[in-house]
Structure formats: C-alpha cells, structure tokens
C-alpha cells in the first residue's frame, strides 16, 4: 500500500490566505475500526450535507472484524448517487488513516470526521462558508457530547467529558452562549484545504493519538487561525463504560506527552495539573512508609479533590436535570479521567520515543 510519509515543514513560512468558491469540492475522511454501532448513523448524517457532484465520503477502515464494512457496503448500495469509498488501513492507526485517505481524496476541502460523530445537517456547508471567507485556515464547530449507551454510567461519562472540571478548557466541548466565532487551540472535526495539509507535510504519524492537536498547533505556528464557529454543531457519542473511558484517556495522556517532547512550545500549564496531582499522590503515599507526616499531608489533598468533584457533580447534574444516580457516579468518572490522563502523561514523558 502506498502511503504519505510525514515530513517536517518550515513552521515559520509565511501564511497564505485561501479564498474558496462557494461550492468548493469536499472530501470527508472517516477513520474507523469496529464501529458497526455508529458508522451507519455517521454516514446517514453526512449523506445530504453537500451537492453530490462536489462531494465524496471516504471511510478508511482498520480491517474491522465486526460488521462495519458490511454497513458501509449496504450504505453504498442504498445511496448510488453519492460517492462513498472504502479504503483499507492495515496500519490501524488514525494519523495514517487520515494521510492515506486525504492523499486519495479528490476534494479541495477536507473534512475530518469520526464514526462516533453525528454532524448537524449544515455542518459541512457552514465550514466551507467560513473557510471561503479567507480568515481561517482550519474551521470546526462545537461538539454536543451524548451518552454512548442508555445507562447511568454512560450519562455520567457524557457529562464529565463536557465539563471544565473533567476536561479543562477544550472550548469545542464546552457550552457557550451566542454564535460568535472564536480563535481556539484546536477543534475536534476540522475542515481545511487539501493544499494546507500538503504544505504542512500531513499528519504526524509518529503520534498515534493527539495528531489533530499537533496539526492545528503547526497551523497556528505559521501565523494562521483555527476558528470555532457556532452556527452548526456535531453530536459526539462518548465512551459507554469506565473501562473504555480509562483506556481512551490513558491513550490521550501518553501521546500528549509524546507531542510535548517533540514540540515543547506547545505545552500549556493546565496540562500539568492532572500529572502533578497523580505524582503528588504517588510520592506522598510512598513517603508515608518512612514518614507518617506524608500520609497526613495526603489526606487533605484527597479530601479537597473529593469535595471539588462532589460540588461539580451536584452543579452539573442539577443544571442538566440528570438523575441522582448520575450525580453519585460523576466523582468516580472525574477521577478516572484525571488519574488515567495524568498517569499516562507521566509514562509518556519517561518512556523511550520508539516505545508504543
């Protein structure tokens, strides 16, 4: 299989503005693996987003062994008017899937989507309109996080991953008033020109996660803008269980650390909060075997964290009118996010770069 190899571009080259025709051609790229539950809904939400003659959807599948490929095939048959392509991704990682799909894309504009995402009916059209204004290199819309299952824990997870106490200031996931555009560090499901992707050398395939933040960091390092527009949105289905959530955030933290090692200037102080919390727990707990005063210091730290988690759990569930069960579960979900992300971030800092 041919592939696009990431190459380090000159991040300081002069920025170029892009003016697009109203109906620029669009290619939607969806990396996926074993997504039989969600891929059909994602395709259904994307099918009528844009004039079919200027539009294609490319599903880059990591050799799924469930019914994902069958669902895509059935959708192709039921929508003969729409160009839907299914490409194989034996590498089974997201940055490779994106590079491979974009290299094969025919569109001037690339829309990076996810099998867990359900964009509003005007998502693609609105992104193209904003790009066409020539004021931004990358455009995205807010995510409305939905439960990944009809269970109390899934509802609690959906609340946690869209709450500032859970995930910090990821603005594309946080509720905001008004329809104003905003400059941001990154967006979840970005639209950008294929020429920009080429100029940047593609997505960095050394980063198996966090490749989108890295891409947008390199865009901003060129002096160009990443804009969050709020006139459309995308529903995103969160992980349904604590085990899957922990696995997701363990992966996020580890690869965030790897990105920071490669690009130290991308570090934000807020990204050190969870690792510092985990490190302090570990150090105080270990030191307590030698000096009991360390355990005495650990107790108020954990009590303060628990109090904050309970406070924000009550606040969030009351605001969203969630049941009492969600409020009881939220502190455990918050801790799962912070401990998984913080632990894996520290692990990513100390392990060799070649270790996956």
Model-derived segments and spans:
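Conserved donor NDP-sugar-binding/catalytic core segment of glycosyltransferases
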Residues: 118-155, 159-161, 237
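Short, acidic, metal-binding catalytic loop of nucleotide-sugar glycosyltransferases
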Residues: 21, 44-54
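A conserved acidic beta->alpha catalytic loop
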Residues: 45, 61-70, 91, 114-120
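Short, well-formed alpha-helical segments that are part of the catalytic scaffolds
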Residues: 10-13, 35-48
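Catalytic donor/gating beta->alpha subdomain of glycosyltransferases that bind UDP-sugars
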Residues: 147, 204-267
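Glycine-rich, basic loop-to-helix element that forms the pyrophosphate-binding segment
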Residues: 89-105, 125-126
């Amino acid at each position: 299989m041919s592939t696009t190899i990431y190459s380090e571009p000159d991040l300081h080259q002069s920025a170029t503005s892009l003016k697009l025709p109203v109906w620029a051609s669009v290619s939607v790229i969806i990396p996926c693996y074993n997504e039989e539950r969600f891929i059909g809904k994602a395709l259904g939400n994307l099918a009528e987003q844009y004039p079919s003659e200027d539009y294609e959807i490319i599903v880059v599948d990591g050799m799924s062994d469930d019914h994902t490929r069958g669902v895509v095939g059935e959708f192709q048959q039921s929508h003969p008017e729409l160009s839907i392509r299914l490409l194989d991704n034996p590498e089974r990682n997201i940055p490779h899937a994106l590079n491979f799909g974009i290299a094969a894309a025919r569109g001037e504009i690339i829309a990076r989507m996810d099998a867990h995402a359900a964009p509003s009916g005007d998502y693609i059209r609105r992104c193209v309109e904003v790009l066409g204004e020539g004021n931004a290199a990358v455009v995205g819309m807010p995510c409305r996080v939905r439960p990944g299952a009809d269970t109390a824990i899934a509802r609690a997870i959906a609340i946690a991953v869209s709450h500032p106490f859970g995930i910090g200031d990821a603005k594309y996931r946080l509720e905001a008033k008004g329809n104003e555009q905003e400059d941001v560090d990154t967006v979840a499901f970005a639209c950008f020109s294929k020429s920009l992707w080429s100029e940047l050398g593609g997505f960095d395939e050394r980063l198996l996660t966090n490749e989108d933040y890295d891409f947008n960091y390199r865009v901003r390092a060129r002096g160009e803008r990443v804009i969050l527009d709020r006139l459309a949105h995308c529903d995103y289905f969160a992980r349904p269980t604590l085990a899957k959530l922990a696995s997701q955030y363990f992966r996020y933290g580890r690869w965030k650390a790897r990105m920071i090692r490669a690009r130290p200037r991308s570090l934000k102080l807020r990204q050190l909060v969870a690792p510092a919390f985990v490190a302090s727990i570990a150090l105080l707990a270990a030191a307590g075997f030698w000096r009991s005063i360390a355990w005495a210091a650990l107790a108020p730290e954990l009590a303060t964290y628990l109090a904050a988690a309970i406070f924000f759990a009550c606040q969030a569930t009351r605001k969203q009118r969630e049941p009492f069960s969600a409020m009881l579960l939220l502190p455990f979900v918050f801790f799962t996010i912070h401990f998984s992300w913080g632990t894996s971030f520290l692990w990513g800092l100390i392990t060799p770069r070649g270790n996956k």
